[in-house]
Amino acid sequence: MTSEIQILQAALWSSMPDALRLQDRPSSWVTANKPGAKVDSFLEGPTMAPDGALWVVDIPYGRILRIAPDGTWTVMADYDGWPNGMRYRPDGTLCIADYKRGILRLDPQTGTITPLFEGYRSEGFKGCNDLWFAQDGTLFFTDQGQTGLHDPSGRVYRAGPDLSDLEVLLDTGPSPNGLVTNDAGTELYVAMTRSCEIWRMPLFATGTSKVGLFARVPAGRSGPDGLALDRLGNLYVCHASRGAVFVYNPHGDQIARIDC
């Protein structure tokens, strides 16, 4: 058990220019999720490009933005959707987890968006949240919708490297959100936002088994969101309402907190 938790302070790197903030554009997402509020953007899904640029999504306004290493912001796509998560696929294309439209593919050169998965066995998704590609190209994504402790029916899906054979790995999640695999591709970690937990899912060719609790995250107005692993196997857990990133070692002990 780690006895001392290191506290770090994050520094602001870049801020969205005022010219890109949408004050008066109608948004059904804002109406549904933040009624009466003035929301000029809601950024999610950060993913690093090979050239060092950072890509993010703007959920309420269906925008995909690129932030160059020098801090320059560019709108790369603007479409009818609620993009929530985004990752690079091994072939160099970007894939988006979209709450309204499912899993999409984005050509980063042209901004063209095409559907990959719009549902499962003639049933629509609840509302896709985030996605992850393992090193071999296997796709994992969460279908969060409005699930929570009152309705623990959120799903985690898997598709092969050729994006075929979509399967449900888990359908009992209380708001599955961010997810990440270990380098070996033998374990999947999933943030369960409403229960403030990180679940560990052993991975097998036939699915998963003995899914367990890896770590409990401090509760609050929200819960754990995006996840990342470093080369030492430490897990980084973003927590929006706490304004912090919690860091856990491979045994599930908290070793650090990054305040934002």
Q: In which residue ranges do the predicted regions lie?
A:
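Blade/loop signatures of beta-propeller domains
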Residues: 1-28, 150-153
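Beta-strand-rich domains and repeat architectures in extracellular enzymes and scaffolds
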Residues: 14-63
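Short, solvent-exposed loop/turn segments at conserved positions within beta-propeller repeat blades
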Residues: 59-60, 99, 147-154, 193-196, ...
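Loop/turn-rich, solvent-exposed surfaces of beta-rich toroidal or solenoidal domains
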Residues: 197, 208-211, 215-253
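Beta-rich, blade/repeat-based domains predominating
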Residues: 34-51, 79-102, 121-139, 146-147, ...
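A short loop-to-beta-strand structural motif that recurs across blades of beta-propeller domains
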Residues: 63-65, 102-104, 154-157, 197-199, ...
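Short loop/turn segments that connect beta-strands within beta-propeller blades
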Residues: 67-72, 107-111, 160-164, 202-207, ...
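A short beta-strand motif characteristic of beta-propeller blades
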Residues: 29-36, 71-77, 114-121, 164-170, ...
